[in-house]
Amino acid sequence: MLSFGLGAIAQGDKSSCPGNLSIFAEFAKVKNYDSAYQPWKEVLTTCPELNVATFKYGERILAHKIKNASDDKTAYVQELMALYDDWITYFPTTKSGKSETGKILSSKAQAMIDYKSGSTLEAYEIFNQAFVQDAASFTSPKSLYTFFNTTFNLYKEGSLSTEELFNKYEEISEKFELEQTNLARKLDVVLNKEDAGEPVTSREQRNKRVYETNVLAFSTYANNLDAIISKESSCENLIPLYRKNFEANKTNSVWLNRAASRMDAKECSDDPLFVELVEALHGINPSANSAYYLGLLKDKAGDSQGALAYYEESLTLEQDQYRKAAILYKIAVKFKTKGLKSKARSYAKRALANQPSMGKAYMLIANLYAASANDCGNTQFEKRAVYWLAAKTARRAANVDSGVKKTALKMAASYEGRAPSKTDIFTEGNAGQTIRFSCWINDSVTVPQL
């Protein structure tokens, strides 16, 4: 019979605790969780305050027990729930004093969903408690996604309003962006050293692999987050919702910025409400975002010079290099849509100067090159050689950004398939030669050796 919760358990002989801690830790390190269970349980029951390892390894031990239980898993699931509660009681912070409450509570809520323990509402409330009390340590992309999926399920059941759904979507989306930016900052330190030819330590290489794994996870779950709400976040739904709440929020810069951002992202910016949102936002809080949106309005009015002036003002107002990179990329996309390839590349390169790990900027440039194949080069061979440059640029995207790696590699393979074949190179007899493109690309490629 398993026992839960430590409050009612009398503290026994603590002399065996250090030995049992050492025993279960050694078993757990080699994933022999069945052997680790009993000494771990004795430490948890007798001296839970001894070491945080009791809770970190305990989470893994109980996950193993739940997965491999031959009969009813309920007892182990309940024990896991109690473990999270006791974890917060005994080790709510790290050694340096940073709160772990958000991490622990979100792990508990995730386990409730994974093991179908408790109701959807109960899991939501614990997720929300974690997010409100300590968002800083609530960093798991899976749990952030599950938090919103739980929110969405409650909305579909009628327990949450449309407004509550969108508010939570904005909050969680912003958290995803924050964590992705934090990862980019760390990854770019290593990328900059590599690009400069500086030696990279083995620790930095290991860290880079961890960053890349996390970048991919955040990218995947962020895309899934958007997919959940795609139908609800149509212009037909957004505009009436924002119109209804505009008067009450026209001096709320956070609300105005979120509404304008969502309308821009969903291409609802042709509606007059977008103009009202942007003007209200810029009136109470002139910022990089509001200047960018004013640039959009100028663009839509056909005033390209006025738009560019606002875009540049936006960049001047923005002090953070990663937010600046995001704005530069959006401007690059606008110019690409207009067919202004050289300007689009220029802004994409400026984005990369601020965030070297922004793979989508390299992909945009690769796409610009591929779209110019018929406009560059004097011969058919030279025109098709542009695809080598496009493929090279797409591969660079894959190398710096694991979040787009799969798509970028497919793009590169597609471009390489359109480039001259080995037979073409043999016929031309130009293996190893350099081909320079004198069009707007103003770059060169080396013909592959046979």
Regions found by a protein language model. Give the residues of each.
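TPR/TPR-like (Sel1-like) alpha-helical repeat modules
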Residues: T45-P48, A75-Y90, E122-Q133, L160-D188, ...
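Generic helix N-cap/helix-start motif at coil->alpha-helix transitions
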Residues: G12-N20, N51, S99-S107, S137-L144, ...
